[in-house]
Amino acid sequence: MTLSIRPDTVSAAQMVSSLSTQQTPTVTEAEMVQAVRTLLIGLGENPDREGLLDTPKRVVKALQFLTKGYNESLDELLNGAVFTEDANEMVLIRDIDIFSSCEHHILPIIGRAHVAYIPNGKVIGLSKIARVCEMYARRLQVQERLTLQIADALQGLLKPQGVAVVIEATHMCMVMRGVQKPGSWTVTSAMRGVFAEDARTREEFMNLVRHNANFH
């Protein structure tokens, strides 16, 4: 297994800007279906043959599902599931399955996220952490930005002592095409608050999540 370590290369300001770039679709679903038909023809296929008759509609529906995070918001997602609590020790959810799509080739990114925070008077429903990961993953992404968005969303929502996010993923654009390197994994991290400032806290988190990735 090869691990490709990518540092946090996107600033918080760039991350916030990226959250506000969603635009209202300017084409209809019928136009999207026609575009897929055109792609099939361009590939030398016949979209009117039996096996492909409904493929354009299916592709559009699949892409809409895979990018449904654009139509979700943190407020709707949380639904008030933030609670006052005196807890001040690390809360960690490990091995959250991540399915995203790379924005360069629209091919799958498959991996797992490890998310921790140290409360500062507020805690969040555990399932909501997974849902935050899901919301940002269901968009066209790069792994670096996905990692930062999850960390900064939780930091903004809870104002905790700190947030830590690590994502380990394999990118089909490196496996199925291009360099064709199955078995390579990309690891990204984002540390906020005490996780960035205190080496011992960061090391405790890394020790808890350190394990061999196994997504077979």
UniProtKB/Swiss-Prot annotation:
Top EC group: hydrolase
CDD domains cross-referenced by the UniProt entry: GTP_cyclohydro1
GO cellular component: cytoplasm
Pathway involvement of the protein, from the record: Cofactor biosynthesis; 7,8-dihydroneopterin triphosphate biosynthesis; 7,8-dihydroneopterin triphosphate from GTP: step 1/1
Keyword annotations: GTP-binding, Hydrolase, Nucleotide-binding, One-carbon metabolism
Gene Ontology biological process terms in this record: one-carbon metabolic process; tetrahydrobiopterin biosynthetic process; tetrahydrofolate biosynthetic process
EC assignment: 3.5.4.16
Catalytic activity line of the entry: GTP + H2O = 7,8-dihydroneopterin 3'-triphosphate + formate + H(+)
Signal peptide: none
MF term (GO), any: GTP cyclohydrolase I activity
Keyword Nucleotide-binding: yes
Alphabetized SUPFAM superfamilies for the sequence: Tetrahydrobiopterin biosynthesis enzymes-like
PROSITE patterns xref list: GTP_CYCLOHYDROL_1_1, GTP_CYCLOHYDROL_1_2
Record-linked InterPro entries: GTP-CH-I_C/QueF, GTP-CH-I_N, GTP_CycHdrlase_I, GTP_CycHdrlase_I_CS, GTP_CycHdrlase_I_dom
Quaternary structure note: Homomer.
PANTHER family: GTP CYCLOHYDROLASE 1, GTP CYCLOHYDROLASE I
Similarity remark: Belongs to the GTP cyclohydrolase I family.
Name listed for the protein in its UniProt record: GTP cyclohydrolase 1 2
Organism, as annotated: Nostoc sp. (strain PCC 7120 / SAG 25.82 / UTEX 2576)
